[in-house]
């Protein structure tokens, strides 16, 4: 029957003889007394005969309002607690990702960007962003473009979410529905000379037929791996001195893990690793690396350290890329490339057919003329 202190008031309540002052006193007490609140619930749940003995209407004893007021207070208290916990989670997330000069936040952004550019030929991450959420979560968007001539064409958008350092792909959308680039390479150790010559002839014939006012994207495979310094005179020998010669935009990196199979020798997406002409880092130390070779080796180090993330971004089996072995090979043997994606005027690219160093070619996209310096 409620607590002993208010026993007499409860008896008056059941008889319907409470005064207005006694009613207010009992209401205030019920809000702070769990025992009396339980007793009130029991009284309200009783059958009709008990309800008939409730105080007359003119006494205005709305005890049901006390019950609901208490419930709303409880709900409000829970909501406040949830908001406080969420705010604390946000502060902890900000501290976790932005500590040490945003190191973890840069990793969340850097690794997927490098992975996309390393596994998708002629791709660059040129937009998007990362938002830090409560409880050590982030959401990121990566806007990809490809370079055809002097124009950057939208390629697609990748969206990711992460918890701590674990990353997942949440959405992929390509401009051309399903992205299937016609960019392939062949390793120099493959001996299928006749096939490579015939397949490449189709590319050269197409470039010969297209209008002069076009630019194109061509992937070429070399007769051996070359250093970046060795490529400069090789390309100069093809295009000679020009104000705006065709531009290399992506390189197929020789990592010692390329498939060498005379029956299955065409390397497509997932079979190779490469790097763009301009490797983008968020980390200040990596950005300050002086040479392209040093940047490539650092890129491979980062990718090998985060192999699970790279495989998720590239949507490849965990054992396919062997990034640890690739990184070690490049570090020990230096940066050499066995192919590249190059873009420029279609008729200029046609000159590559005369180079003794080009064994194989595939044709990517062709666009209307945009070959001018902005």
Where are the regions that the model predicts?
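Extracytoplasmic/luminal low-complexity segments enriched in Pro/Gly and acidic/polar residues
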Residues: 282-374
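N-terminal, intrinsically disordered, polar/charged segments of Gram-positive cell-envelope systems
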Residues: 48-65, 94-193
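Membrane-helix interfacial "entry" motifs
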Residues: 62-70, 74
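Short, charge-enriched, intrinsically disordered boundary segments that mark the beginning
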Residues: 1-10
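Hydrophobic membrane-insertion alpha-helices, especially the h-region
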Residues: 75-92
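Extracytoplasmic beta-rich ectodomain segments of secreted or membrane-anchored proteins
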Residues: 142-280
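Short cysteine/histidine-rich zinc-coordinating motifs and their immediately flanking basic loops
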Residues: 15-16, 44-51
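N-terminal amphipathic alpha-helical interaction or autoinhibitory segments
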Residues: 17-42
């Amino acid at each position: 029957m409620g607590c002993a202190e208010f026993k007499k008031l409860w008896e008056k309540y059941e008889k319907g003889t409470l005064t207005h002052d006694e009613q207010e006193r009992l209401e205030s007490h019920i809000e702070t007394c769990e025992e009396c609140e339980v007793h009130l619930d029991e009284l309200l749940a009783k059958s009709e005969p008990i309800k008939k003995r409730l105080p007359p209407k003119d006494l205005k004893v709305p005890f049901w309002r006390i019950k609901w007021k208490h419930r709303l207070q409880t709900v409000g208290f829970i909501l406040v607690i949830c908001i406080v916990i969420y705010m604390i989670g946000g502060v902890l997330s900000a501290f976790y990702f932005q500590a040490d000069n945003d190191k973890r936040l840069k990793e969340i952004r850097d690794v997927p960007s490098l992975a996309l550019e390393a596994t998708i030929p002629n791709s660059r991450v040129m937009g998007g962003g990362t938002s830090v959420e409560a409880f050590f979560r982030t959401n990121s968007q990566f806007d990809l473009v490809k370079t055809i001539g002097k124009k950057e064409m939208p390629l697609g958008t990748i969206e990711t979410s992460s918890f701590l350092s674990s990353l997942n792909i949440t959405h992929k959308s390509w401009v051309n529905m399903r992205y299937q680039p016609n960019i392939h390479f062949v390793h120099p150790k493959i001996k299928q000379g006749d096939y490579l010559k015939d397949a490449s002839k189709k590319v050269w014939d197409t470039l010969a037929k297209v209008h002069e006012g076009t630019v194109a994207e061509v992937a070429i495979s070399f007769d051996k791996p070359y250093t970046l310094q060795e490529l400069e005179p090789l390309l100069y020998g093809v295009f000679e001195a020009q104000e705006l010669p065709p531009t290399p935009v992506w390189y197929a990196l020789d990592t010692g893990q390329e498939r060498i199979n005379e029956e299955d020798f065409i390397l497509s997406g997932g079979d190779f690793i490469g790097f763009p002409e301009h490797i983008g880092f968020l980390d200040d130390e990596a950005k300050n690396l002086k040479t392209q070779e040093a940047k490539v080796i650092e890129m491979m180090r980062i990718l090998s350290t985060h192999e699970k993330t790279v495989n998720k971004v590239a949507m490849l089996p965990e054992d396919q890329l062997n990034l640890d072995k690739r990184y070690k090979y490049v570090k020990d043997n230096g940066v050499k490339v066995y192919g590249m994606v190059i873009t420029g005027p279609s008729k200029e690219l046609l000159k590559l057919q005369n180079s003794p160093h080009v064994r194989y070619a595939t044709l990517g996209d062709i666009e209307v003329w945009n070959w001018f310096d902005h």
